[in-house]
UniProtKB/Swiss-Prot annotation:
Protein's organism: Streptomyces griseus subsp. griseus (strain JCM 4626 / CBS 651.72 / NBRC 13350 / KCC S-0626 / ISP 5235)
CDD domains the record matches: ProRS-INS (cd04334), ProRS_anticodon_short (cd00861), ProRS_core_prok (cd00779)
Stated family: Belongs to the class-II aminoacyl-tRNA synthetase family. ProS type 1 subfamily.
Molecular function via GO: aminoacyl-tRNA deacylase activity; ATP binding; proline-tRNA ligase activity
Signal peptide annotation: none
The encoding gene: proS
Gene Ontology biological process terms in this record: prolyl-tRNA aminoacylation
Stored PROSITE patterns: AA_TRNA_LIGASE_II
Protein name: Proline--tRNA ligase
InterPro entries: aa-tRNA-synt_IIb, aa-tRNA-synth_II, aa-tRNA-synth_II/BPL/LPL, Anticodon-bd, Anticodon-bd_dom_sf, Pro-tRNA-ligase_IIa, Pro-tRNA-synth_IIa_bac-type, Pro-tRNA-Synthase_IIa_type1
Amino acid sequence: MAQVQRMSRLMVKTLRDDPADAETLSHKLLVRAGYVRRNAAGIWSWLPLGKKVLDNISNVVREEMDAIGAQEVLLPALLPKEPYEASGRWEEYGDLLFRLKDRKGGDYLLGPTHEEIFTQTVKDQCTSYKDLPVMLYQIQTKYRDEARPRSGVLRGREFQMKDSYSFDTTDEGLAHSYALHRAAYIKIFERLGLDHRIVSAVSGAMGGSASEEFLAPAAAGEDTFADCPNCDYAANTEAVTFALAPVDGSAHGAVEELDTPDTPTIETLAAHLGVPASATLKNLLVKVDGEIVAVGVPGHREVDLGKLGEHLAPAVVELVTAEDFVGRDDLVRGYVGPQGLEKVRYLADPRVAPGTSWITGANKEGKHARNVVAGRDFEVDEYLDVVVVEEGDPCPKCGTGLVLDRAIEIGHIFQLGRKYADTFQLDVLGQQGKPVRVTMGSYGIGVSRAVAALTEQTADDKGLCWPREIAPADVHVVAAGKALQTELALDVSEKLNAAGLRVLVDDRPGVSPGVKFTDSELIGVPKILVAGRRSADGVLELKDRRTGEREELTVDEAIARLTADLA
């Protein structure tokens, strides 16, 4: 049984004012309530109350992972270079990796994620189809050298994460393991009290095919997702697609060259011709692994460079600079058009469908062209959905206008397939006596990030407001200050603890009742029990932290009520 936590002995220092550098609600409140302390940019200490919340979340995750048959392990955070070099992620992760050398000059990294090491572990431990399927997980610190760590524990350079991996001999087995994890994640986030959405996502540097994110809607979120109000479609904006729908372009006239001096931008061109930007074709030049590539999108839309990068990964995508036009007579800056670009690969968004007509650059200084028809006057080498998704864009599933919302990514699940198994030749002996290539899934939950997400969703103007399952205590008993009140508070705390409840009691001497009441709301335990003015009568005040409802109860009534409410 847990002991009663006495605040007179607990290392907790609350603050009245927000940290000067805090922007998000979770950053402000977790620091003010004494849950975390900043050591450096993106590096945080979890203090006693914060560590309890972190552990409670980890325990929920652990219980649900165990329930689907996953086995807990702990792999090293300090990892050798070679596996990540073999997978390509030593280079692909770039500056995001913390790299170091040992005293002998060997290259190492601090693990950002563990697909490579888990693959090698299973290759060593599992040699027959009889050893599979297997699901392994760990709860461990990850390290990523974020360029701009911010928002407190939402985006740190080290963070707590649950990562798990499934290993199967068939695609059907992978689909089953994926479904088990998906269902477990739903249970985990429901138990944590996190409002969440499951959305389609892209796999990014993780690789693989099917991918879904678990997002917690919050104003402080760094992710934007598209939600359909009419059907069940939801996707990260980088995963939203637009169907290619060719149109009949036979009625369009011949290409007409236009004199358009001093119109190198879509805005100046549209104003000069008196046409909407949507009638123009924007041709963005980028470098893909050093090769100049043109990307065509409607003039009133922006290219989503993240989306473009996902489509072209693992290639490196960069915007061109003025120097890239030197010696390129075929590229006229500000007047590029798709027609006649023989030396440049031309990619286009599906909105630039065959048969659509555009006003676009004529590849001559001060000149544009009208009636330039896709499929007639220029060919698209590849169609890629690359525009920034906007509010009201049609739902890919039903056509209703999409709604955009901000959210915090709290989980991500992937069907990796055989990407890493191929890299490390992960085979087992099959039923027919022949090697069978293993197929994998990868599944992550941001444990420390979930603390911040819950804060963003549940806190109010008074402070934190934890769901019971992850709160640092079930009941916060407050002794108003006098000796009799303190004696009653300690007595009822022991009785509540004996009844199986986790109790935090504020017995700090020399602290005013007002400060204690304010701290009880800031700390955010679900139930607050006050030994105050009626202590001599054996009467306490019970307050619900979330609703603010209050009632006076005797000691026995309070114990009965709390044990029933928190059972």
